[in-house]
Curated annotation (Swiss-Prot):
It is an enzyme of class 2 (transferase). Keywords: Amino-acid biosynthesis, ATP-binding, Cytoplasm, Kinase, Nucleotide-binding, Proline biosynthesis, Transferase. It is found in: Cytoplasm. This is Glutamate 5-kinase. Catalyzes the transfer of a phosphate group to glutamate to form L-glutamate 5-phosphate. It comes from Citrobacter koseri (strain ATCC BAA-895 / CDC 4225-83 / SGSC4696). Its main location: cytoplasm. HAMAP family: ProB (MF_00456). One of its GO terms (molecular function) is ATP binding. The gene is proB. GO terms for biological process: L-proline biosynthetic process. GO terms for cellular component: cytosol. ATP binds at K10, T169, D170, T211, G212, G213, M214, G215, T216, K217.
Amino acid sequence: MSDSQTLVVKLGTSVLTGGSRRLNRAHIVELVRQCAQLHAAGHRIVIVTSGAIAAGREHLGYPELPATIASKQLLAAVGQSRLIQLWEQLFSIYGIHIGQMLLTRADMEDRERFLNARDTLRALLDNNIVPVINENDAVATAEIKVGDNDNLSALAAILAGADKLLLLTDQQGLFTADPRTNPQAELIKDVYGIDDALRAIAGDSVSGLGTGGMGTKLQAADVACRAGIDTIIAAGSKPGVIGDVMAGISAGTRFHAQASPLENRKRWIFGAPPAGEITVDEGATSAILERGSSLLPKGIKSVTGNFSRGEVIRIRNQEGRDIAHGVTRYNSDALRRIAGHHSQQIDAILGYEYGPVAVHRDDMITR
């Protein structure tokens, strides 16, 4: 075993249930055994767990509920305590303490809360405690609608300063086509950069209990790799998969980390869920992507959502493609008023100004 490393393991609902309606406790026991073995060898382990909704449904006897957000939140509220109790019981067999962290998008959108979450997570690791992380499903409406503990695990990996992120799923990895419908599909073993062609071949999970698919796993891999974290998508059912990944043995699809990872502040910008979005014209698109320029108000065509100065927003071209994320220097109302105008007109329009740019290039990450 090499020197101590930090590994974030994301366990999807399909892995925890084996594709059934209830938690597969025997399989979870085996996953905990693998994690405990690495922990005993001096490695730092972080668990990002799905399954709260599935656990709640099982505990309540599979009630027939309307397909609403409130129903999912009800199940999550019941299931979260059952889920964390299970993790605690299983890790205690090996004398390992766990610490629960429930996060929401707001914890990532706000820089101060992001740093507080980072400090808490690293304090747990420094004291040999295994953090068990989940999205706060009972209150995080946006997470359940869009859903994805995949992206949450990438953010957890950034918070933890992880060396590797392992996304365990019900598939062997990323294939050249959907292996369920195309027998010619081949496993892609190594990925050195995520592009539109790769996104186009990503299929969705068939599990009806979870909320993520292969598309969200690609998003998570993109975020983690750009932060300097190797990411692996592999089958949770593969014997010894967690130990194999830590030992560098080939398993599933490996997304290789960028050689020059983003600095800490830009990791936050890249990982934070956008509070809104703006659409920019062709000139602004070229300036941002080709010359690394700041975004001026003149290039803004439209503003979507309500957000405050200092929040992370998405920047899109007129075809609707994401080109960057950045910290806005003006709130959404102000941007709507100065959109399409020259920077010299900002003070006359608003009665104040925070500088000539809408998003500075130092506060921007291109996609």
